Design a protein with these regions (language model features):
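Short, hydrophobic beta-strand segments that form beta-sheet elements in well-ordered domains
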Residues: 21-23, 54-59, 98-100
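Conserved acidic residues
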Residues: 19, 73, 96
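Short acidic-hydrophobic, aromatic-tinged amphipathic segments that line or gate anion-handling sites
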Residues: 74-84
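Terminal domain-start leader segments
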Residues: 1-53, 93
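Conserved small/polar residues in nucleotide/adenosyl-binding loops
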Residues: 192-194
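Flexible, acidic/His-enriched mid-domain "rim/lid" segments that flank
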Residues: 3, 53, 83-188
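Short, basic/glycine-rich phosphate-binding loops at helix/coil junctions
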Residues: 64-71, 154
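Short, polar loop motifs at secondary-structure junctions
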Residues: 58-65, 103-108
Length: 194
């Protein structure tokens, strides 16, 4: 699934004359490699060139959370004394047109532009959304499973099987969340990869 998505996005990049795609926090990173970056002040970024294998630039402290997928992406972990922006800039050598994820922290974008003032920077969303908006049969099946689970809970809620009286909004939310998990729903099935 991830390899197919990478291949499709590289084809789209070539058709849009984009040399490289940079993805950080947000929904794109899990969609393409199955990993959701922690919203830290340390840079985690997937560098996808229009050809070749992508590279995930990640802080050492976050490295243990990554599921290795060596046929899909390389991992470049950086330590406290290393400059991750320089690692990304080096990976972009020769790139002119670069698309960056909408949820990338501004400070990382500014630092990258300081090092590479001649790149033509654009938003990645026009490319990534083309892929993310069209669901495969597997994705549709997973969405249907998630919807069925939530429908069961909604039915219990409508029939008074979930206690609401005397509960705070937070308590009701926690109970609904607990029941969603009990029904087999999880972030991976629901949001992160679909």
């Amino acid at each position: 699934m991830f390899l197919e998505r990478i291949s499709k996005v590289q084809n789209l990049m070539r058709s849009h004359n984009i040399d490289a795609l940079l993805l950080s926090t947000g929904a794109d990173l899990p969609y393409f490699i199955g990993y959701e970056a922690m919203p830290l002040e340390r840079l985690t970024m997937l560098v996808i060139r229009d050809e070749g294998q992508p590279m995930l630039v990640i802080p050492q402290l976050e490295r243990a959370r990554v599921i290795e997928r060596p046929t899909i992406f390389d991992i470049c972990e950086w330590g406290e004394t290393e400059d991750p922006i320089e690692i990304v800039a080096t990976a972009l050598t020769g790139s002119v047109r670069v698309a960056i994820g909408d949820t990338t922290w501004t400070r990382f974008t500014i630092e990258l532009l300081k090092r590479m003032p001649n790149i033509d920077l654009s938003r990645a969303n026009p490319i990534t959304s083309q892929l993310r908006s069209i669901k495969s049969a597997e994705e549709l099946d997973r969405l249907q499973l998630a919807a069925n689970a939530v429908d069961k809970i909604a039915h219990r809620l409508q029939n008074g099987q979930i206690e609401l009286i005397g509960k705070t909004e937070k308590q009701v939310s926690e109970e609904l969340g607990r029941q969603i998990i009990e029904e087999g729903h999880n972030k991976e099935i629901g949001r992160a990869h679909v």
